[in-house]
Amino acid sequence: MTVIVSSVHADIYMYIDDNGVMHFTNAPTSNQHEYKVYLKERTSVSTRFHATDKYDKLISNASEEFNLDSRLLKAMIKAESDFDPRAISRKGAMGLMQIMPENFKMLNLENPFDPWQNIRAGAQYFKKLYKRFNGKLALSLAAYNAGPTAVDRYKNIPPYQETEEYVRRVLRYYRTFKQL
């Protein structure tokens, strides 16, 4: 079994603006806002492909609550964050299931770095998309990645390289987890 260890050196700071919108940064740039440390620095991250069972109970609970296949949620987490609960994408998506800040309120997500809150919110959001796209898995995954309006606009998987690769990657991981 291979273990990859990398160092991360950054606290995450947060402030809430006058409209109630939460803003996150690793480097506060202004004295105008009251930044609070939201997530303390950690010294190392250990990621192993085969050691994905750490969150199995949380994934199982969310899959039962929203009537989703736990192996699908696990595949999404693998594709989204590689099981790093502190992952932040370049577009600002956060946590295991990479929830965008604009969806926090709708999903009642208070702490995107809390594994249970994030998995539950991601499952809830995916289930909403799955219903919206009539149980079509590929379209639902594309909507999770690119947003539902992009899928509506193209009436198919949007022709975005990132989204096309995301759908293929999740489906590949899903097949793998089904075989385990």
Which residues are covered by each model-predicted region?
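Short N-terminal segments immediately surrounding and downstream of signal-peptide cleavage
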Residues: 12-27
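N-terminal signal peptide c-region/cleavage motif recognized by signal peptidases
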Residues: 5-7
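Catalytic glycan-binding domains that act on GlcNAc-containing polysaccharides
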Residues: 26-180
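Short loop/turn microsegments at loop-to-beta-strand junctions
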Residues: 10-12, 94-95
